[in-house]
Amino acid sequence: MPWSVLEALRNNPELLIESMKKRCKDPQPVYEAIRVDEEWRKTLQEVERLRHEHNKITREVAKAKDKAEREALIKKAKELLALKEELEKKLKELEAKREEILLSLPNLVHPSVPEGCDEDHNVPVRFWGKPKVWKGHLEEFEKQTKRWGFEVEHEVVEEKPVGHADMLEKVLRLGNTYKAAQVASSRFYYLFKDLVWLDYALMMYAMDFLSKKGFVLVEPPYMVRYKVLRGVIDVETFKDAIYKIEGEDLYLIATSEHPLAAYKMEEIIDESELPIKLAGVSPCFRKEAGAGNRDLKGIFRVHQFHKVEQFVFSKPEDSWEVLEELIRNAEELVKGLELPYRVVNVCGGELGSPAAKKYDLEVWYPAQGKYRELVSASNCTDWQSYRLKIRYRIKGGKKHDFVHTLNSTALATTRTITAILENHQLPDGRVRIPRALRKYLEPFESAPKDYIEPWTGI
């Protein structure tokens, strides 16, 4: 199959137009692509006509016996050749223009993606766990559950839980964002003692889980070239969110998804190798330029963090089943951490350009009284593979097709720590460590085992 966006342009342009509208974007680029493609096809037909005519006259030259007739035919052949070459040049220019427009378009939206332009239109598909709901947040809790037709069992608490930022710096005193801001800038942090152990235990937990599921653990490069970035994201939209190395064609990765996608760049994979399941383990670096003053306190939204990422190269016919597998994996991990959550089907207006469909897994934050994103799982179909030139060889033939690429968070450690601090805090200031993490701490004598304890600080 050809690239899905080009195929839609040729055979069902209305699909592209509706997809843009569903994303709450102006479909004008699609109309422009249609115009350019129609002109390209007309020009191609004219080139073919001229080629046929030139070949015909060339054969007539060989047969001509009269000198004047031969010279007239040769002159005509040269004129046709010059005209054909001129149109071939125009053809290449139109093809480049069409490609430029099509590459600027986001992916085709899957039919199951909800309508809507902002996160209020994300549709919950399931809930898990018994959240602790402060009595002052009951109305807000019902808006996030009953509004969508879900009756979620919950525990009403009289005292408002302590927010994760205050737990971090005032109660436990195991983090310091004020000093980090002096040393670096806002949205950086120092973590100490038990929280450092917890950070690495979370990574080990996710790595162990995914390796047992058949994922290959990968520690990728922490920087990528511009051509890789251009192949995996909409660079123009996100250029202010990415750290560039001054004077070099290198960018710090915002997620291991990007170098993992590029691992098979410009390759043809044998069909028998698919699916290829990778678990990326890396630090991530994000400017968070568009975050403004949101989540300035604590370590919920930061410039650097550790993350374990799921990434899959899949056959097109299997990719939607793989997406469900990825979100189920994330759910298993979060269930193991005993964190109440919901899964939402993200609406069209909230989808990033590469994603045809995305699920967010949102954990309940008792102090905030809302579900917050912990995991995102996306099917990017052939949006990335077309740009990175990743194909697979179909069994029994020479035909090649673009693979589908999928990604999902397994665990992002700092954000997961904030969820643990809010959901597992105790009245005496300690925080209960989820049982699933304890085996990754037990081998180390100085590591916490059952509880994270308040500290006097340094």
Swiss-Prot record:
Question: Which residues are listed for ATP binding in this entry?
Answer: 286-288, 302, 373-376
Q: Name one GO cellular component term.
A: cytoplasm
GO terms for biological process? Answer: selenocysteine biosynthetic process; seryl-tRNA aminoacylation
Q: Which enzyme class, named as a word?
A: ligase
Report if keyword Transmembrane helix is assigned: no
Tell me the subunit arrangement.
Answer: Homodimer. The tRNA molecule binds across the dimer.
Q: Which PANTHER family match?
A: SERYL-TRNA SYNTHETASE
NCBIfam families, per this entry?
Answer: serS
Q: Which family does it belong to?
A: Belongs to the class-II aminoacyl-tRNA synthetase family. Type-1 seryl-tRNA synthetase subfamily.
What is this protein's record name? Answer: Serine--tRNA ligase
